């Protein structure tokens, strides 16, 4: 009988990287001959608040607290989710509801990750411990983390260290996305065996992302310089302009602001823009990853507010530290040398082999008997 593997990540909203990374993880789990199931965890809120939010999502002519736009953006990913996401559970909001879903679905293991699932300010809704799989304490269901990220290089709440340490002690296998997370696991939570692995978007082959484009956005897109910048500023615009001049690219496409619903594209088009660009400037972690996947010359602008550690960790693994520029420096120096992707791809292949071996071994339920 095919083993059923629950996947727990942050709630699916309009974040491109958050959606495509769980699809990639699902694809790899399926390639192992296992059956992935997406565990739908939403933030805990009082019943009346949930009712108000549902009304705001569907009520045209307003965008109070951005609920309407977020809802409409997620609708644009319907075709992607239908094609690339696995079977989904019912929505759960508490650890108790998640436990009931795991039992109902007959899961053999639960994998938490990837993305910033262990970043406390992202998960502290009164049930942060769900992302440390508290709902599986006392259950025979196997507990694994894959490329879980703390988002920063420190844990902000000393009062919860003991609780998190106790929960992580019950995991059969722990892996994290950043080297700083590996250090946190060892120094703060007693898991010196935590493994540093690749983001799921790098775990799968490039062919997975080409399939996304072929399914949702076939054909060719814009060439030239593509700027995918989440947090805009005059300093970042200066970097974009400098990159355009340096690369002698007069054609510059700047992605629409995140709050611009009219210009919000589906995932197929989003991925295609990286594939078809000649040069990329981005302050997005997954924007940086897709620049690497499609072998683009790029500049990554440090995004401290959204988590700078993850940029530095991956770039260091690949020997691409010089591609990171940080706004605030008196003078930004753009990298001069071209990226040697034959070397980078060899390194990715090594890390991919290690990451695949970790997850394959972690999900080998037969090994428990």
Language-model features and meaning:
Residues 1-369:
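Active-site anion-handling motifs in enzyme catalytic cores
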């Amino acid at each position: 009988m095919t083993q059923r593997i629950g996947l727990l990540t942050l709630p699916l909203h309009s974040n491109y990287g958050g959606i495509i990374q769980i699809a990639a993880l699902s694809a790899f789990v399926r390639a192992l001959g296992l059956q992935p199931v997406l565990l739908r965890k939403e933030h805990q809120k009082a019943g009346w608040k949930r009712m108000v939010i549902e009304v705001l999502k569907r009520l045209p002519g307003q965008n109070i607290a951005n609920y309407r736009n977020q809802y409409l953006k997620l609708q644009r990913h319907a075709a992607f989710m239908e094609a690339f996401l696995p079977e989904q559970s019912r929505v759960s909001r508490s650890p108790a509801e998640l436990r009931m879903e795991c039992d109902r679905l007959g899961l053999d293991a639960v994998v938490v990750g990837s993305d910033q699932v262990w970043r406390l300010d992202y998960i502290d809704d009164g049930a942060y411990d769900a992302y440390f799989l508290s709902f599986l304490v006392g259950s025979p269901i196997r507990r694994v983390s894959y490329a879980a990220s703390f988002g920063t290089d420190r844990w902000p709440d000393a009062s919860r260290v003991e609780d998190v340490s106790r929960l992580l002690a019950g995991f059969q296998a722990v892996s994290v996305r950043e080297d700083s997370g590996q250090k946190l696991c060892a120094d703060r939570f007693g898991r010196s065996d935590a493994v540093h692995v690749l983001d799921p978007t790098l775990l799968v082959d490039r062919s997975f992302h080409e399939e996304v484009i072929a399914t949702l956005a076939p054909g060719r897109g814009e060439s030239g310089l593509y700027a995918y910048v989440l947090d805009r500023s005059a300093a970042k615009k200066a970097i974009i302009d400098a990159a355009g001049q340096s690369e002698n690219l007069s054609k510059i496409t700047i992605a629409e602001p995140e709050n611009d619903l009219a210009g919000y594209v589906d995932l197929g088009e989003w991925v295609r823009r990286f594939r078809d660009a000649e040069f990329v400037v981005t302050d997005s972690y997954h924007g940086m990853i897709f620049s690497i996947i499609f072998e683009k010359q790029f500049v990554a602008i440090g995004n401290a507010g959204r988590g700078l550690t993850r940029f530095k960790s991956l770039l260091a693994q690949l020997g691409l530290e010089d591609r990171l520029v940080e706004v605030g420096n008196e003078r930004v120096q753009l990298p001069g040398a071209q990226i040697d992707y034959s070397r980078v791809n060899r390194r990715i292949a090594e890390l991919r082999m290690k990451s695949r071996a970790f997850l394959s071994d972690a999900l080998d339920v037969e090994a428990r008997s």
